[in-house]
Amino acid sequence: GDLPIVVNPPRKAKASSDFRFFCDSYFPLTFSLPWSDDHLKVIARIEQAVLRGGLFAMAMPRGSGKSTISECACIWSVLYGHREFVCLIGSDEGHAMDMLDAIKMELDGNDLLLDDFPEAVYPIHCLDGIANRCNGQLYKGERTHIGWTAREVVLPTIAESKASAAIIK
């Protein structure tokens, strides 16, 4: 069948180049407190690195949201096609796996992402939490090639999607 329509095109368009707006709009329960100056600096550096390229290291106190902001940056960068491949690096393998699990939970359970990114998120929702369905999933007669493993996520291959076949590992 057809993909659902985008519920809020203006919101989706604005968030394309505004990482803070993306976080506030699509993760309102996660980012319910006001941003600190340090957070705003980190957000600006992430935005610059994703949109224009580059690397940076982020150091903030424990519990200040480093992992959560990083997870949302991964989602933002692939959904808009800013990046085709994102590598998560945690303090150890377990932490990196936890971060990937958090990203998978958002892609599978965040209704705001489903509303505005049906081309990337709707096929994931159609799996109904059963990863084995990835292999047989079709869209318009073509396989979506979703990857949904413990170590990586491959977003569905959909011709009109900027996130088509993006990888988070």
Q: Language-model segments: what does each one mean?
A:
Residues 43-47, 68-79:
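Contiguous, well-ordered alpha-helical segments that form the cores/surfaces of helical PPI scaffolds
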Residues 55-57, 85-87, 167:
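Residue-level preference for the first positions of well-ordered beta-strands
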Residues 1-54:
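N-terminal accessory segments
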Residues 52-72:
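Walker A/P-loop
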Residues 52, 82-83, 163-165:
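Short, well-ordered loop/turn elements at secondary-structure boundaries
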Residues 77-85, 108-112:
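Post-Walker A helix-loop "phosphate-sensing" segment adjacent to the P-loop in P-loop NTPases
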Residues 89-169:
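Conserved nucleotide-state-sensing and coupling region of NTP-binding domains
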Residues 63-65, 75-76, 93-96:
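A short acidic, glycine/proline-enriched capping/turn motif at secondary-structure boundaries
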